Amino acid sequence: MLTATSVPSLWRLARVEYDDVRKRPVLLYPEGAVLLNDTGAAILKLVDGQRSVSDIARVLSEQYNGAGSADPTEILNDVTAYLSTLAARELIRDQ
């Protein structure tokens, strides 16, 4: 399980691309694909092997708090849970 201080990176054989047929982003890997919603794509766009989970949540919080509706703690919890789910599938690694 990832924590706020984990520095996630995509597995080297995984990549995010836009699927023209499905009209949405997908996380592709040799054994399959994960369809992404806008939130998942926004999170994975920030996964670069440099930012911590906390950094990613902070950037998203700044983006979404422009509307004043996003709780930073809730965003951190959601980002951590989402990336931990992908880490359990070995699509995300902790540096």
Question: For each predicted feature, which ranges?
Answer:
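Long, charge-rich, low-complexity alpha-helical segments
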Residues: 33-95
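Acidic, low-complexity/disordered tracts enriched in E/D and polar residues
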Residues: 1-45
